[in-house]
């Protein structure tokens, strides 16, 4: 099966199709599974017992290949900037 890469800059990502798909970043950083989109934000959740939640701006999405939503940020950026505030405290 051939994957179709859809660049986000063309505003052609169908956001309802990314729910329950994998979210990844630079160097294959794992941001878990997309739980929902809300406004300009993609909410992902990683982990089974020790869940981490990320609130990633749609503007950082690079492409969606049908299985994975790729972002243009590193794992460190996601952990330091886009985590749930309650988890950081």
Map each language-model feature to its residues.
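Peripheral interaction segments used for macromolecular assembly
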Residues: 1-89
């Amino acid at each position: 099966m051939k994957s179709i890469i859809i660049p986000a800059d063309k505003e052609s990502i169908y956001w309802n199709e990314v729910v329950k798909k994998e979210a990844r970043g630079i160097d294959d950083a794992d941001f878990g599974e997309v739980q929902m989109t809300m406004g300009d934000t993609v909410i992902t959740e990683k982990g089974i017992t020790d869940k981490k939640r990320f609130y990633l701006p749609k503007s950082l999405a690079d492409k969606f290949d049908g299985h994975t939503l790729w972002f243009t940020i590193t794992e460190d950026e996601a952990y330091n900037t886009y985590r749930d505030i309650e988890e950081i405290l």
